[in-house]
Amino acid sequence: MNTEATHDQNEALTTGARLRNAREQLGLSQQAVAERLCLKVSTVRDIEEDKAPADLASTFLRGYIRSYARLVHIPEEELLLGLEKQAPLRAAKVAPMQSFSLGKRRKKRDGWLMTFTWLVLFVVIGLSGAWWWQDHKAQQEEITTMADQSSAELSSNSEQGQSVPLNTSTTTDPATTSTPPASVDTTATNTQTPAVTAPAPAVDPQQNAVVSPSQANVDTAATPAPTAATTPDGAAPLPTDQAGVTTPVADPNALVMNFTADCWLEVTDATGKKLFSGMQRKDGNLNLTGQAPYKLKIGAPAAVQIQYQGKPVDLSRFIRTNQVARLTLNAEQSPAQ
């Protein structure tokens, strides 16, 4: 009889009232319950007064009530049944509407973010393409300008070369003027021939190279046949043999270039003299000598192989960027931009 009366009394009480009575029986205050459940005191007060905060979703409200019931030792199922009877509409309608509005706002925000991202991406791609095109166009214009300059210089040099007359008939070599005395002396005995050719070492090597054929002809023509037969080695004494002409020593600062394709090139030495300026064809070779350091401009670095002081010059950084190579080769063979 008493149990049924208590059960009827509990059913008459609301969810908030039952929680408040259980809290008071345990001697707990609203502040203590709020601290244990990590809630605000105002939230605990609204639950006990059966108020549902407008900014609080029904899912969270049910979770708070379940935690509160466990704290005060009340069966959770009884409280949830009573809560559904008190506010069935709010649990059915309010939550879906709020979820729909949140999803709509999130979708709108994501759309704006995606649009802005694509806009930034297009701007970056456009700027990169414009920069590349301007750089490529500037390089092509520079190569064209340098090729035109070299063509103009070659044409002017060819015109000057055609206007200069050749004076080979009027110029006389000092060594050739001494030929008549040599022929007169060679008519004597064979013992006088070394005396005539003895002054030859004092003559310049370049003059010896020119005079030696004429002197050889004069000696062989003027000397009688028996005299030529009496020589031990059977050869007439040539001035070039007695002069001791030495081959020139290779310049240590020589610049050697081999071309694997057509390439425009300009080389200037330390004095500002242009050693070469023009177009080199495929499979061509170029050997230049001047005063170091050398300044080089190469239109197609991938088409040329350079050796300086017997060592190869690295052009890989210009080949990777596909740009006109401007470098300086100093005495230590350290190319610099």
Curated annotation (Swiss-Prot):
Any one cellular-component term (Gene Ontology): plasma membrane
UniProt GO MF annotations: DNA binding
CDD domains to which the protein is assigned, alphabetical: HTH_XRE (cd00093)
Record feature DNA-binding region, as residue ranges: 30-49
Polar residues biased stretches: 145-167, 208-218
Pfam families attached to this UniProt entry: HTH_25, RodZ_C
Coiled-coil intervals: none
Presence of the UniProt keyword DNA-binding in the record: yes
GO BP field: regulation of cell shape
Keywords per UniProt: Cell inner membrane, Cell membrane, Cell shape, DNA-binding, Membrane, Signal-anchor, Transmembrane, Transmembrane helix
Biased composition (Low complexity): 168-207, 219-235
Ranges of the Cytoplasmic topological domain: 1-111
Transmembrane segments: 112-132
Lipid bilayer topology: Single-pass type II membrane protein
Renumbered residue ranges of the record's region Disordered: 145-235
Membrane topology (Periplasmic): 133-337
Stretches assigned to the HTH cro/C1-type domain: 19-71
Disulfide bonds: none
Main localisation: membrane
Localization annotation: Cell inner membrane
Record's function text: Cytoskeletal protein that is involved in cell-shape control through regulation of the length of the long axis.
Comment on protein domains: The helix-turn-helix (HTH) motif in the cytoplasmic domain of the N-terminus is involved in the formation of spirals to maintain the rigid rod shape. As this protein is anchored in the cytoplasmic membrane, the HTH motif may contribute to protein-protein interactions to form the RodZ helix, which is localized beneath the cytoplasmic membrane. The C-terminal domain may be critical for determination of the rod shape by probably interacting with enzymes required for synthesis of the peptidoglycan layer, including PBPs in the periplasm.
Stated family: Belongs to the RodZ family.
Protein name: Cytoskeleton protein RodZ
Lineage: Bacteria, Pseudomonadati, Pseudomonadota, Gammaproteobacteria, Enterobacterales
